[in-house]
Amino acid sequence: MAELSIASGIVGLLSLGIQVTQSLISFYSAYKDQDGDLAKITQNFEDLQGIFQSLESAVQDRQSQGDMDEVLKEVDKAMQGCHEIIEELQKECQKLHTDLGLSLKGHIQVAGRRAAYPFRKSTLQKLKEDTARNQNQLDLFLHSLPKDLDETYERILCSIDENYVDDVCRILTLLCFSARPLTINELIDAHAVDLSASPHLDREGRSYEQNDLIDICLGLIEISKTEDSGQQLLIARIAHFSVQEYLQSERIQQQKANRFAIQSGPANTEITQICLVYLLEPMLSSGVLDTIKIKEFPLAHFAAEYWYHHYVNSREGRLKVEELLQRLFQYDTNCFVTWIRIYGLDRQGTLRPNSDYQRPIDDIGSPFYYASLLGLESTLSNMIAAGARDASFLEMVNAQSGEYGNALQAASSGGHWKVVQMLLDQGADVNAQSGRYGNALHAASSRGHKKVVQMLLDHGANVSTQGRELTLW
């Protein structure tokens, strides 16, 4: 609606400009044969009218292109000069005619009653200069109009204060690639994560407010209201899909705004880092975990549930987050337990709640188990390297743990064949009975992971264990 209002105002103003210049052309045309100056002035008015018509056409063309809110705002801003020019033309028109509604014939009759040449040379000279100046201004304005959305977005991005460039890049990255829409409070906390040499949640950055984000992003984002379980939420979004398309396009790479370009791999890597740093925040894991604590850390649920989604989509950027993963999957920290309590990923597909803030420790699998469930090869490899010399390591490999019973069944259910091979190499019991599927072979078969099924069979998996029916393919 705002877009239509802006467009209507611009078109209305230009239409008035066309009307006024037509009236002036009609008047001066009656005299233009008497003096070269009058002929020049008439031509100037005709040129002005042509520019107004071109501007009107340009605005209407842009309006028809779809979401052109930012283009029209740019046009409206630049139209301030047109306001002044048209007001000046109106005053000139009012000097000559008390009634703009007179027909051309009426103007000629009025002119005929005047003296044969009622114009002063000084007046004509000034009018000629004024119309030429107005023509130049409008012509410059016409050529300065953004040709399309790309040029509009480029101008907006290049006009962002240098002090806020990194902030805007972070915000746009989050909104373009977050696994689900972010609330304004989630976005503020995600923006507040400092990924410098010592990654941490920056207290000062958390003091941002909704209007701060909107102001520095110059119309590239918007806030909408929605309801979830009766609670009203403010959701932050990219203002239009065309903004995201431009930011991810190859075109932006060739433009001045190229530092704002966003690519899937690096963007997902950055969001993975943000989520992991947030989960490693000491204050989140200290004290009692309850709804009050979660309210203090609004990004906690998103970070707990979606860091793995973004990790998978990081591609070659996964190595950059390995150190953070090692910290999260440590045995002697509360961060790991807090993560699982916020989002128990192994409870997916069960009747048990994913979020269980008071989930007993003995109901939570080991970091080794969850690394196997997610197929985190590097993380698991480091754990194996660190624990291989420990006499109790084999017990950990086969430990009864979590919804899937043990690490091998967890890895098999996800089809993580490389992890399955690592576990088998470490002596994992291929026929261990426990968990959701009973054993690793049934887990792999039920999920259609043929390669894992074959690997388990090659290592002695018993097809008829406990009488379960096994479908191999």
UniProtKB/Swiss-Prot annotation:
Residues making up the signal peptide according to the UniProt record: 1-23
Keywords: ANK repeat, Glycoprotein, Pigment, Repeat, Signal
S-S pairs: none
Domain of life (superkingdom): Eukaryota
PROSITE patterns found in the cross-reference section: ANK_REP_REGION (PS50297), ANK_REPEAT (PS50088)
Inducers of expression: Expression seems not to be regulated by the azaphilone pigments (MonAzPs) gene cluster-specific transcription regulator pigB.
KW Repeat (keyword) present: yes
Documented applications: As colorants, MonAzPs are widely used in various food products for centuries. Moreover, MonAzPs also possess wide-ranging biological activities such as antibacterial activity, preventing hypertension, lowering cholesterol levels, causing hypolipidemic effects, and displaying antiobesity and antitumor activities.
Stretches forming ANK repeats: 403-432, 436-465
UniProt GO molecular function: pigment binding
A Pfam family assignment: PigL_N
Glycosylation sites: N462
Record PANTHER family: AMELOGENIN (PTHR10039), GPI INOSITOL-DEACYLASE (PTHR10039:SF16)
Reported function: Part of the gene cluster that mediates the biosynthesis of azaphilone pigments (MonAzPs), a complex mixture of compounds with a common azaphilone skeleton very widely used as food colorants. Seems not to play a direct role in the biosynthesis but might have a regulatorx function.
Protein name: Azaphilone pigments biosynthesis cluster protein L
Gene: pigL
